[in-house]
A protein has these predicted regions:
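Active-site palm subdomain of RNA-directed nucleic acid polymerases
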Residues: 60-78, 103, 179-208
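Short, charged alpha-helical motifs in flexible N/C-terminal segments and linkers
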Residues: 1-36, 42-46, 99-107, 229-247, ...
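Short, conserved micro-motifs composed of acidic
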Residues: 161, 223, 238-277
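Catalytic palm active-site di-aspartate
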Residues: 52-55, 78, 108-118, 170-178, ...
């Protein structure tokens, strides 16, 4: 159990009772609690006192998720708060399509929508209507209506609670059900008959457009995006136009359009979306040409900040603990979104490669001029290219879906690996095989295709 999880168990709830105390009496309260929850489902009433608790919410959430999965109600293009999906999946999906468009010289533009306080402005009446449309009726409808009504909310600061206020809109913050209800509220956007391909992660929405030429694409977007604006307006969700931007993609600057904004007339008001040279999307910095130099510099800033801790502890902790720190503090930054940016050309990842080697030499007490090939072989760690290869093969073997360069990588691995079912056995044997061959054999197919 992590230190943060231990603190959560020690911290009491609104009633002053700690989780660790509840665990002691769990057997004694299970039966009456089960009876109470059963009666709530039968009556369609969510008791006010339980609105401050999470147990009933978790049961209700589990049943709702089971129903949504059974009838495949939520769109496949929703990635937020969904089991088995992550921000990196949304990034990979869009970047793969953009890569294909750039390779085929297809003009493409992505609009990144920013919403003003999306979670706080969800309209309860419209949310209940959305729930009814997807089959929540009778007691199920009444139960969620009861859950949302007369709901108090307060803030805890330094152990003290603020005065309770009753919320009239928005999904309850810090709750189990809140994110799920927001997904349901947003789900209808995928039913809009629009040209753009919509991807969402919570309140981060991206719409990807592609066309035959830049001029026609501008006309398509200015006509099509109005539908999306109207949908947000109909759901009482406000677009923050000052933070909503678009990014065109192409191989070179000469392949990009010359316009810098899109204009929309909504209810006699002129709205404008401006073009930007790069944008941070779900923690990954995209640029016009998907060269990733800006994103790599962004990663470098983060890992350099963390590396000072490792350098400081280098003479205090053992190699075992320093390795653990590396995997906990450095490697997550190197692997986040790597399926999108891992194919950046070596000149753009050079500084990151140098950083990784230097930090590994500190951890494993190697001299500055220690040979790179021998370093990675000795410490049995992966460089950036190997991490990209590893994650690409793992993703491709699991989903068998298109992934930039992954099919070419897949041809390299042995047949007995390909024949394994996806799981721990496959991943373990893939890592073992990856350690058995030289780094240059992995670098070659990547560098051949991108440099």
């Amino acid at each position: 159990m992590s230190e943060q999880e231990e603190k959560c168990l020690q911290r009491p709830g609104f009633d002053g009772i700690k989780s660790e105390h509840l665990k002691i009496i769990a057997e004694d309260i299970t039966e009456p609690l089960t009876y109470l929850i059963k009666k709530c489902f039968e009556s369609g009433i969510y008791p006010s006192i339980l609105k401050k608790a999470k147990v009933f919410e978790k049961v209700l959430s589990t049943r709702m998720i089971r129903y949504l999965k059974k009838f495949k109600i939520l769109s496949e293009n929703q990635y937020g708060f969904t089991e088995g999906k992550a921000t990196s999946d949304a990034i990979t999906k869009n970047v793969n399509q953009i890569h294909q468009n750039i390779d085929n010289r297809i003009p493409s533009i992505c609009i990144f929508v920013d919403l003003k306080k999306a979670f706080d402005t969800v309209n309860h009446k419209l949310l209940l209507e959305a729930l009814e449309r997807i089959g929540f009726r009778g007691n199920a409808y009444s139960l969620i209506e009861s859950y949302l009504s007369n709901r108090p909310q307060s803030v805890q600061i330094s152990g003290s609670f603020s005065k309770e206020m009753y919320i009239k809109c928005g999904v309850p913050q810090g709750t189990v059900l809140g994110p799920l209800l927001f997904n349901i509220y947003l789900n209808d956007i995928f039913q809009i008959n629009c040209v753009g391909k919509i991807t969402s992660f919570a309140d981060d929405t991206a719409i990807l457009y592609e066309g035959t030429d830049w001029s026609d694409l501008k006309n398509v977007i200015e006509n099509d995006f109005i539908k999306i604006i109207r949908w947000f307006n109909s759901r009482k969700l406000s677009i923050n136009y000052s933070k909503t931007h678009f990014l065109p993609f192409g191989s070179y600057a000469r392949h990009l359009p010359n316009y810098t904004n899109f204009s929309f007339n909504i209810n006699d008001q002129k709205m404008q979306i401006n073009r930007v040279p790069n944008i941070k999307y779900l923690g990954v910095v995209l640029d016009h040409h998907l060269r990733w130099d800006i994103h790599v510099n962004y990663i470098l800033k983060k890992v350099r900040f963390v590396s000072y801790k490792i350098k400081y502890l280098g003479n205090i902790l053992t190699e075992k603990y320093l390795r653990t720190l590396y995997h906990a503090l450095i490697e997550p930054h190197l692997t986040y979104g790597i399926l999108a940016w891992g194919a950046a050309c070596s000149s753009h990842t050079y500084n990151l490669d140098v950083f990784q080697k230097s930090i590994l030499k500190i951890i494993f007490k190697k001299p500055k001029l220690y040979p790179t090939e021998k370093l990675y072989a000795d410490v049995r760690m992966y460089d950036i290219r190997q991490l990209y290869f590893l994650h690409s093969i793992t993703h491709y073997h699991k989903f068998r879906s298109y992934l930039y360069l992954a099919p070419k990588f897949y041809d390299i691995i042995p047949k007995d690996l390909k024949d394994l079912r996806f799981g721990n056995c496959f991943k373990r044997n893939l890592k073992k095989w990856l350690h058995s061959i030289s780094r240059t054999e992995i670098h070659k197919p990547i560098n051949t295709n991108i440099n």
